[in-house]
Curated annotation (Swiss-Prot):
Gene Ontology MF annotations: DNA binding; DNA ligase (NAD+) activity; metal ion binding
Coiled coil: none
Keywords linked to the UniProt accession: DNA damage, DNA repair, DNA replication, Ligase, Magnesium, Manganese, Metal-binding, NAD, Zinc
Keyword check for Ligase: yes
Organism expressing this protein natively: Serratia proteamaculans (strain 568)
A Pfam family matched in the record: HHH_5
Full protein name: DNA ligase
E.C. code: 6.5.1.2
Residues annotated for Zn(2+) binding in this entry: C408, C411, C426, C432
Catalytic reactions of this protein: NAD(+) + (deoxyribonucleotide)n-3'-hydroxyl + 5'-phospho-(deoxyribonucleotide)m = (deoxyribonucleotide)n+m + AMP + beta-nicotinamide D-nucleotide
Family affiliation: Belongs to the NAD-dependent DNA ligase family. LigA subfamily.
Active site: K115
Enzyme class: ligase
GO biological process, one term: DNA replication
Amino acid sequence: MESIIQQINQLRTSLRHHEYQYHVLDAPEVPDAEYDRLMGELRALESAHPELITADSPTQRVGAAPLAAFDQVRHEVPMLSLDNVFDEESFLAFYKRVQDRLKSSDPLTFCCELKLDGLAVSLLYEDGELVRAATRGDGTTGENITSNVRTIRAIPLRLTGDNIPRRLEVRGEVFMPQAGFEQMNEEARRKDGKIFANPRNAAAGSIRQLDPRITAKRPLTFFCYGVGLLEGGELPRSHWQRLMQFKDWGLPVSDRAKRCTGSDEVLAFYRQVEQDRTQLGFDIDGVVVKIDDIDLQETLGFVARAPRWATAFKFPAQEQITQVREVEFQVGRTGAITPVARLEPVLVAGVIVSNATLHNADEIERLGLRIGDTVIVRRAGDVIPQVVGVIAERRPADAREILFPQHCPVCGSDVERVEGEAVARCTGGLICAAQRKEALKHFVSRRALDVDGMGDKIIEQLVEKEYVKNPADLFRLSAGILTGLDRMGPKSAQNLVNALEKSKQTTFARFLYALGIREVGEATAANLAAHFGTLDKLLAADIEALKEVPEVGEIVAKHTRHFLDEELNQQVIQELVSDEIGINWPAPVVIVAEEIDSPFAGKTVVLTGSLSQLSRDEAKDRLTALGAKVSGSVSKKTDLVIAGEAAGSKLVKAQELGIEVIDEAEMIRLLGA
């Protein structure tokens, strides 16, 4: 028995430590899956030995102590957490338990919602006015974050509509959309500021700022999902209908919430959300399944720390612990040298991960990473796996320092790091085989010259056999040469020659994008093409002339001019448009915005968030056809922002600058006007 008591005490100590790191310091040391594993072990031991359960066990409470820096708030109705299930079998067991408690075999109706990965908050409205906001804290006592929450534009300061209760406590999640998170971290890197490991940490850190002016600059948003205190009014006796009522009063509710009857419908909802997860624009880690009927909720009641009528149906963990075996350095299209960690293979989010990006030397230093370290690796959707933390206490004695190369690992050229930039680059240009391969892959890609059938493996063979040294060489390939490549028969070779010939008919914007100029993406290439109209005018433009192009600042102008000034690049461009190769595009058609009868004519428009009725490309094309200039970033020159679902930092910046904002439905209406 002594060993069991010791094991239980060790688990409790470890869990309390991780709760403090997660909830109070916003600096978790282990992924959620590791915490869940420890909690599962403790629950199993306490279940087998109920006489050892104590009131202060982590299984008996919700979270960690509140920060002393904030005033404390006592929740009149405790903010409980949820029990978890991790697979379909466990969910079906939960479903059966609920049926058994209700003594009914009838299909159960649930309200199914997204399990947002943010920070749970309580919003208290009195006579429709927001008077207090608080964190969950330990479920009984939280932190008063009213000043910070008032800066979140998604949260109404006053409810609108009829029959608003005298006192209503709404509960929900403050979170940070992925686009806003990425932009915030990018800005922090440029200013040597704090880099957040993930959007959840960023949201928690932002909402707990002692200075609300800092919170106001963070791209936070909110969805509500429930109610706590209710006085002086009534709410529907259906959870789903309550969400709809909240929506009518002006509170944001996710449009992915759905009422499902029977276990099959719930499982179908779970699978669909898991499939759509990467398209949402914000992080979730599962779905929440709640009995819809409030009377049945009250019948089922609660256990010590969670309701019996709800569960969190979690997705496979997106973070896991593994070990760094080695670090290698890869060279990209623009010469950027990226360190890549070779890992002990580990299952993350349903995929075996053996490599993870380390970004740059600054990131290695920030992490304090060494070869041999035990690390937390994260994989979210289709995002490249990355190391987000080091578990320093597990560092072995023989851990090795990571030395960034002074010479390119591919061609041996000097490595250069420009002052103010985080990225180190190979100076070899197209003499570097790695840069050559990536530049050619970009040149033939779908959004560039769009050479059908010219895949990565073909490019790699062409470079390795030295058949191709620059983009112009692609158009000198014959079917005979191509037939000598692996898995390339005469018919496939001729098809590829035909595809190369077809790709010569392109647009000026695609041609510029295909060249691979640093910082010149599709939108910038389109702006350059529209502004200058011809290649000759662009080639003659100095930096000041380039800066006159919409969304082209000092940095992009310098990169563009530097690219065009390089002798090898000039030679390749002239070869590509020469009579020998003959890449060409239609003469520019000048669109006079004043002559177009459209509400978008002459306006600089920015799209942000996820669109449901049109793809991003379709929306851009239709807006451009109606005389708009579609930009990739918000500035004082922006006239209009179109905000889709989970719009992030661009929406926040537009609101700060007082720029007009419309939603997708209004855009669709105006497109048809």
